[in-house]
């Protein structure tokens, strides 16, 4: 369970402390998650570089991009101004490209699995948040609008976390 304030907003130290120490801790945790997953799936085993914030994150917002993997320098880059809850999954997503998983759906699934390896509830939440859109779309296709509306009432508390890009 992710701690929330009385307004339903997620409480997390990195939300107030956007220092390089907190972001470094988050990047280190993303690497640790991928390495834990690598113990289970040998294709994901090995060294991972530290995910780096993109200098042009504002441009990435305009393109609705959460990250970018640059294979020639082996850099996993993430959008530094996106909503905090999306950063763990975005970091793991970009790191999964390092292991040759170039298709976005594969990288998304690996990021989801990696985030669940963490003891940090924010990482776990980010992993679940990263796949909720796929689940909602599949539910709509399989069950229709009425069932979707009923399901959305159950997942209403996630609304605040569905924001990919911040306002500022």
Predicted regions and their residues:
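A cross-kingdom signal targeting lumenal/periplasmic-facing segments of multi-pass membrane
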Residues: 56-60, 77, 164-168
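A mature extracytoplasmic/lumenal domain signature
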Residues: 80-84, 111
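Long, well-structured alpha-helical subdomains associated
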Residues: 121-168
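Extracytoplasmic
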Residues: 71-75, 83-87
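Contiguous, non-catalytic segments that form substrate-binding/exosite surfaces or channel walls
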Residues: 1-74
């Amino acid at each position: 369970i992710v701690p929330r304030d009385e307004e339903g907003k997620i409480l997390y130290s990195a939300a107030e402390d956007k220092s390089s120490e907190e972001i470094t801790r988050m990047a280190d945790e993303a690497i640790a998650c991928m390495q834990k997953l690598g113990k289970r799936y040998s294709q994901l085993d090995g060294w991972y570089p530290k995910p780096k914030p993109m200098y042009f994150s504002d441009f990435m917002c305009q393109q609705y991009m959460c990250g970018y993997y640059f294979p020639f320098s082996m850099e996993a880059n993430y959008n530094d101004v996106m909503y905090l809850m999306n950063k763990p999954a975005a970091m793991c997503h970009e790191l999964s490209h390092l292991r040759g998983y170039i298709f976005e759906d594969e990288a998304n699934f690996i990021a989801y699995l990696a985030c669940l390896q963490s003891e940090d509830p924010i990482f776990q939440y980010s992993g679940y948040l990263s796949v909720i859109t796929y689940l909602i779309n599949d539910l709509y296709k399989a069950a229709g609008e009425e069932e979707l509306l009923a399901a959305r009432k159950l997942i209403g508390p996630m609304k605040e976390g569905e924001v990919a890009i911040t306002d500022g």
